[in-house]
Amino acid sequence: MSMKHSAVAGFAVGAIVVLTSCASTTAAEAPPATVTRVAGSQIPRLQLTDRAIQRLGIVTRPVAEAPAAAVSMGQREIIPYPAVVYDTDGSTWVYVNTATRTYRRQPVTVAAIQGDVAVLASGPPVGAAVVTVGAAELLGTEYNISGEE
């Protein structure tokens, strides 16, 4: 199993465990997450309840601009490496906090990994809030990995 695929497997396992515990609701409770299709896009919008955000431990950090001295190819955006998620074909993504309790997956191109920082060749702009803790669980929610309808 390649490094890329073992990372995906690790994310999927974590997502199943967390989402199963987060997905149980009673008739009086709202579902923990709503997945809404966005017109003209194949990437949906995820809206979580406050309780789901708390249970998943969602944490965000803003995209930062790398100092020119830190990156030999000039100014690039940087994010914490844990914000990067991989889908089944190895594509790299981040979840951007687009509104209150709302997240949307956005493609990124990782130019380099320097310790716990991913240097981006393309991705969200400086200042955008990316999910650094809980991104794998959001991917599981988007793809309904828990198997619940």
Predicted regions and their residues:
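Sec-dependent bacterial lipoprotein signal peptides
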Residues: 1-20
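Short alpha-helical boundary/capping segments at helix-coil junctions
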Residues: 2-4, 22-65, 93-149
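Generic anion/oxyanion-binding catalytic loop in active/binding sites
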Residues: 11-14, 23, 73, 116
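Short, glycine/small-residue-enriched coil/turn segments at secondary-structure junctions
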Residues: 63-77
